């Protein structure tokens, strides 16, 4: 989608969490009679946009790697930090030691931050357990949080996030473990909608990624993939071959791969904050992807190591000023396209009658959202109720 509708002097009304009216205020005044108990938000002078949809997060984890940021700023590489015991495997150790209750408790404040920044729906991945039981623990925590927190969560199984240390010299056995043990149990318990793989040099090859995602598809888990983040590693081609709903990162994607993504109907979910914090020196070619008719979504990639911001407005600012998107394209990327990337566009992502009443009230015109470092959000509405 490329064009966002706009109504001036507008009103929005909901009942039982669903939008029942959106249109000119004059029409609302004679069509809708608010109940005495109704909450009324005066948005005079404000833009009201759909609640943001964050289509790629690693928000559930235990442990703390903020100290690695200082090492990185001092010039240490990710490989050097990993060799010192840091990186993903540091988070794995902490997450394996955590219970469902502990993961819920440490994640809830992160979701609160996301909500205050306007996010009302988000994807949440496992992938810091890397054993059957700890991956299930993460997904059970995600299910609990989805039930208890205002943000709706789309659960993704990502046992193929990294090869754990105990399998380092027998990676084929770990791939088989993911396919033969993890995926069937995740599907049996109904803990995930999606299956994701980190297809990257030194992690999972395109062939391994294809096998894992096909196994997920056969078990009822829809495919998405981390692709071409650190180099041209073939993940985008895997996404196109499988008609995956989303290929994420795509910092190193060429025109041939982009055309294949467009032909296959794959959403390019771009994560400019990840490229920014990892100091990659380049961003995904968002403008080129849009010109080649690839639908573009934007997400935070909030995670313990290289995604320190839970704010989609910050991501929008990067997308506009570092990747060449217009404000309208950035809004579409964080709303309806992101909802489509999560297979939720029939329910959220736009302000339409019948959809969930998820909305963000901006303290001024929508361009205020691009003011990085300050919050331009006056109110966040989730299911028709003010949630932040």
Where do the PLM segments sit?
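Metal-coordinating catalytic core of metallo-dependent amide/deamination hydrolases
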Residues: 89-108, 112, 120-233
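C-terminal cap of metal-dependent C-N hydrolases
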Residues: 1-3, 334-336, 353-388
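Active-site-adjacent C-terminal substructures of enzyme catalytic domains
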Residues: 222-223, 232-347, 362-369, 386-388
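Divalent metal-coordination and catalytic microenvironments
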Residues: 12, 17, 45, 56, ...
């Amino acid at each position: 989608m490329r064009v966002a509708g706009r109504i001036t002097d507008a009103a929005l009304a909901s009942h039982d969490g669903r939008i029942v009216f959106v249109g000119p205020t004059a029409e609302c005044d004679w069509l809708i009679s608010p109940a005495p108990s109704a909450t009324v938000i005066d948005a005079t002078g404000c833009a009201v946009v759909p609640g943001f949809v964050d289509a790629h997060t690693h928000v559930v984890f235990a442990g703390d790697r903020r100290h690695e940021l200082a090492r990185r700023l001092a010039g240490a590489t990710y490989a050097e930090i990993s060799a010192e015991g840091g990186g993903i495997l540091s988070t794995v150790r902490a997450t394996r030691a955590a219970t469902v209750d502990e993961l819920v408790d440490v994640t809830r404040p992160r979701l609160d931050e996301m909500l205050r920044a306007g996010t009302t729906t988000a994807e949440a991945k496992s992938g810091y357990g890397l054993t059957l039981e700890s991956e299930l623990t993460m997904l059970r925590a995600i299910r609990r949080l989805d039930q208890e927190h205002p943000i709706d969560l789309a659960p993704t199984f990502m046992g193929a996030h990294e090869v754990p240390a105990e399998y380092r010299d027998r990676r084929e056995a770990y791939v088989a473990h993911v396919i033969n043990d993890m995926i069937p149990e995740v599907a049996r318990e109904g803990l995930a909608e999606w299956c994701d793989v980190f297809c990257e040099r030194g992690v999972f090859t395109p062939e391994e990624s294809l096998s894992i995602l096909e196994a997920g598809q056969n078990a009822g888990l829809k495919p998405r993939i981390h692709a071409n983040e650190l180099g041209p590693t073939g993940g985008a081609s895997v996404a196109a071959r499988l008609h995956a709903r989303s290929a994420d990162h795509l910092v190193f994607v060429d025109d041939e791969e982009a055309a294949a993504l467009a032909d296959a109907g794959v959403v390019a979910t771009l994560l400019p904050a990840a490229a920014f914090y990892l100091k990659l020196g380049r961003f995904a070619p968002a403008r080129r992807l849009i010109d080649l008719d690839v639908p573009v979504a934007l997400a935070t990639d909030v995670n313990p190591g290289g995604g320190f911001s839970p704010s989609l407005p910050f991501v929008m600012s990067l997308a506009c000023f570092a990747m060449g998107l217009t404000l309208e394209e950035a809004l579409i990327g964080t709303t309806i396209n992101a909802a489509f990337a999560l297979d939720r566009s029939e329910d959220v992502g736009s302000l339409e009658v019948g959809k969930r009443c998820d909305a963000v009230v901006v303290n001024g015109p929508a361009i205020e959202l691009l003011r990085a470092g300050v919050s331009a959000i006056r109110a966040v509405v989730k299911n028709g109720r003010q949630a932040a």
